[in-house]
Each structure stands twice: as structure tokens, then as C-alpha cells.
Amino acid sequence: MYLKRKADAYLNAWKSDPNRSPLIIKGPRQVGKTETIDYFATHNYRSVVEINFVEEPKYRAITADGYGADTIVRNISLIDPAKKFIPGDTLIFFDEIQAHPDIVTALKFFKIDGKYDVICSGSMLGISYKQIESNSVGYKTDYEMRSLDFEEFLWARGYDEAVIESMFTHLCDATPFSEVEMNVFSTAFMDYCVLGGMPAVVASHIRTGTFEGTLQLQRQLILDYQEDIRKYAQGPDQARILNVFNHIPVQLAKENKKFQISKVASGARFKDYRGCVEWLETSGMVNICRCMSYPELPLKGNYDENKFKIYFGDTGLFVAMLDDEASDDLRANRNLGVYKGAMYESIVSEALRKSGYDLYYYKKEDSTLEQDFFVRTREWLVPVEVKSKKGTAKSMRTLIASDSYPEIQFGVKLSAGNIGSSEHVFTAPYFTTFLLRRLLRAYDEGQAPMLNNPER
């Protein structure tokens, strides 16, 4: 079965652009890149020429005698004369380009030639994306795919755009959801927390209507990721990257979720592991949430590189790494146990990252003041609190009330509760997190009345 993705609309818009450049779709392994491109290709082109540099390494020779479009087309035709090139109606799809990054140099010449559309895809494991950038700057477009977000999960469940728009209207107008809406969406969101958004897992759940077999699929994905680390990481970094990856659930279970390299291995030091954390982030396997030096704008560059939290790029992978008893209890009884706070922080971090936000938090030294996340509007810095328990979001209210943080005027609290507003704090259900960026854009345009007139 094909799962509708947000990338579908992006690809259609890309094709309708008369000045389109070759496209590179990057992202972690097994998030649906190949399936999405194949679906788009078969519905939009008379001919599709697909080259997979992992499954068919013989095609790595197509750049041996040059990067010109005609040269590469000729070499592909020599290797397989059945592949047809129809000018103006052919998509050339280079898949798994991490196995042959040299192909990206050719994108400039395909752009200049203009006879064929080109899409590249790859996981970017073990290669320098900066090298690819330098080889194709000005002649390509980038797009990043991740696993399904909650909106795409709702699509898979059969909910249409009208349901999503109704959700968004509730947020903009600060109108609480009905009891039925809260029950339905909260239940669906908890299912999403357990399953995650990896297409194979979601598709299995949709086909069967149950969770049977999904844990096995999730754990196989973990094994595949661990194997990728062994395959692509080099030298002593291989063991270090695996240690960091495998230690994420343990560190998230702590009250203080800051990732501590010293707990990964005896004598471990950050300077030895810096590249390992960056490797995992670049691969898309994890999301890094960086500790701000001070809660003020701008966000970029305003952080301590030695302080960070690590979340999985897909929360379903976090679930898969729990022990059997915890994982079974979560599926059967929705009991999150000691992982409750970690689970909700993880799912919010994932939703924010998939919305295009970089992740930042703040912890004041020698103080209990700590804020889970920060986003921004055009003018203001906005703290985001994740409440797994009932509470008053004390740190957020301190940030809003204090004259020491003039760029913070209101905050957003995400919880299991309904929509509400009190003392400059807008409360919304967890399941609406994927709409937060859109809501703040509406605020910037004066179209979110509650945020424009917060209670004082």
C-alpha cells in the first residue's frame, strides 16, 4: 500500500516549475524516500530510468569518462539498452547516492542540458554532504524527508484535509475540542507514539488494524541502523557512535535528560565523541536539542556546544529499544512508567523537527529554571513546555514574567489537556504539536486571536 506523504505535493510543485533544477531528496534510511519518488515518477513520466548504486554497483562506472549528460545517458544505455530516454518526458532517478556521491557532479550538466528531469536520493551515511554541496552548488535543489508526522499518520488512518483544517481552526480561535474529538485524537496520538512514523511499521498497522508484528519491525529497523553504523563509520568512531546510539534510552530515562558522554563509557570525554554525535545527527537517526547560553534571540549560534539532549529521529525507535516488559506494557496498557516524560519530550521534539525547527532548550546554572524547548515568531522568543503531569509550567511563567527576558511575552504548554489560555500561556493538546509552526505564522499575520490577545 502507498502512504500519502507531504513530499507528494512538493514533488508535484517541483515538476510544475519550468526552471526546476535536479533534486536531491535526503533523509534517514527507510523513511519512504524511494517509495515516494517511485510513486511520483510512475504517475508523471512516460519513462523512468532508475539507477540504484547499492543494488547495481556496475552503474558506478557511468561517470568514469566524464560528467556530461549525454555521456552518462550513453553509458547507462550501453549497460542496459532497455532503458529508454525520452527528451522532455523522462525522469532519471539515482538512488542510494551515498554509494556513488560522484554522480552529484553531473547534476550541473543535466541542469544545463535540460532534456531530462533528475532526482537523487540517499541516506548520506558515511559521506560528507559538504562535498556534495561543493560539487553541485547552484544546480540542485534539496529536500529532506523524515518518517511520517502525525498529520501523515492521520491521512493513513483515513482522515482528510478537512479534519486537519478543523483542528487548526480550533487552535486559531482558541476553541476547545469536543469530548469526542479529544478522545479520538488523543487515542490516535498515543497509537502514533507507540508505532512511530516509519512507513513499514505504519503500513503494517493499517493493514492489520492491530499492533501485532510492529515491535518486531521496529526492532529490525534498530538492527539495520546499528548495521549501518558498523558499515559506514570509520575506525574508533564506529564503537563510539554505537555506544552513543545505544545509550540514548538510558539517558532519556533520567530526571536530567542532558546527554552525559561520561556515562557512555569509562573515561569518555566529549572532545573524543563530538564527531560521533554530529555523525548521528547528520545521518538523521537522531535529533539534537542544544542548550541555549541565554534565552534570547537569535537562536542560531546561541548555545553551549557541550550541553545537549539526544532524541531519536522517530519515537517508535525509542519504544523499540525499551526492554520487553516495558514495551509490552506500553502497547497493552499505554503505561509509560519511568519513560513518560521522555516519551512526550521525544514526540514533541520529533514534531518540532519535522516542522522545520532546530531544537533548543535552556537550563539556568545553579537554579531549577529549565525550559524544554524554544521556537520563535517574527518578533518574539516562545518557550514551549511539555507537561507529562498536571502542573503550572513554573519555569515558563518565570521566563514570561521576568524583565530579564524581554523577548519572551507568551509561551505554549503542551499537555494531555484541552485548549486553554491563562497568564500569557496558551495550552494545547500534544496531538496538535505538528500545527504549532503554522499557528505561530498565523500569529505573525494577526490571524490567531488568542495569541494576539493573551490574558493578563
Region spans (language model):
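N-terminal pre-Walker A segment at the start of P-loop NTPase domains
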Residues: 1-14
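Hydrophobic positions on the alpha1 helix immediately C-terminal to the Walker A/P-loop
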Residues: 36, 40
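Domain-level recognition of nuclease-like catalytic cores that cleave nucleotide substrates
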Residues: 418-456
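Interdomain motor-coupling "hinge/lid" segment immediately C-terminal to the ATP-binding subdomain
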Residues: 131-250
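Accessory nucleic acid-recognition modules appended to NTPase machines
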Residues: 203-378
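Short glycine-rich substrate-engagement loop in P-loop NTPases that contacts/grips substrate
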Residues: 55-88
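Conserved lysine of the Walker
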Residues: 33
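Structural recognition of the conserved hydrophobic beta-strand(s) that form the central parallel beta-sheet
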Residues: 117-123, 144
